[in-house]
Amino acid sequence: MTKLDTTAEVKAIARYVRMSPLKVRRVLDQIRGRSYREALIILEFMPYKACEPVLKVLRSAVANAEHNEGLEPADLVVSQAFADGGPSLRRFRPRAQGRAYQIRKPTCHITVAVAPALADN
C-alpha cells in the first residue's frame, strides 16, 4: 500500500450526475488507491457508461492539484473516491384504466480526491 500525504489532498465533486450511484460505485471501486496514470488507463478501457463522468471528475481533481497546489500529476494517487445519492427525478408512466406508475430517475454526487504519494526513504 502506498503511503499518502493526506495534508495535500485535493478533491473535485460532480453534483447531480444523472446516473445510479450503485453503477458509479462499481467503477470507483476499481480506481480507488491507484495512481493517476493507472486510473486513467482503467477508465479509458472499462465498458461502462459511468466511466465518462468519473474520468471527468478525476481529470478535474488532478487539474485542481496542479493549478492550486502546484503538484505533479505523475506523483498523484486516488486517495478517496465515492458516490453519494442525489435527489431522484420522479416521472410517471401512464398505465391502463387511468392509472400511472412512478418512474424514479436517480442522480448522484461523485467525489474524487487525489493526494501525492510519499517518497520511500
UniProtKB/Swiss-Prot annotation:
Disulfide bonds: none annotated. The keyword Ribosomal protein applies. The keyword Ribonucleoprotein applies. It comes from the Bacteria. SUPFAM superfamilies: Ribosomal protein L22 (SSF54843). GO terms for biological process: translation. Keywords: Ribonucleoprotein, Ribosomal protein, RNA-binding, rRNA-binding. GO terms for molecular function: rRNA binding; structural constituent of ribosome. InterPro entries: Ribosomal_uL22, Ribosomal_uL22_bac/chlpt-type, Ribosomal_uL22_bac/org-type, Ribosomal_uL22_CS, Ribosomal_uL22_sf. It holds the Pfam family Ribosomal_L22. CDD domains: Ribosomal_L22. GO terms for cellular component: cytosolic large ribosomal subunit. PROSITE patterns: RIBOSOMAL_L22 (PS00464). This protein binds specifically to 23S rRNA; its binding is stimulated by other ribosomal proteins, e.g. L4, L17, and L20. It is important during the early stages of 50S assembly. It makes multiple contacts with different domains of the 23S rRNA in the assembled 50S subunit and ribosome. The globular domain of the protein is located near the polypeptide exit tunnel on the outside of the subunit, while an extended beta-hairpin is found that lines the wall of the exit tunnel in the center of the 70S ribosome. Belongs to the universal ribosomal protein uL22 family. HAMAP family: Ribosomal_uL22_B (MF_01331_B). Part of the 50S ribosomal subunit. NCBIfam families: rplV_bact. PANTHER family: CHLOROPLAST 50S RIBOSOMAL PROTEIN L22-RELATED (PTHR13501), LARGE RIBOSOMAL SUBUNIT PROTEIN UL22M (PTHR13501:SF8). This is Large ribosomal subunit protein uL22. It comes from Synechocystis sp. (strain ATCC 27184 / PCC 6803 / Kazusa).
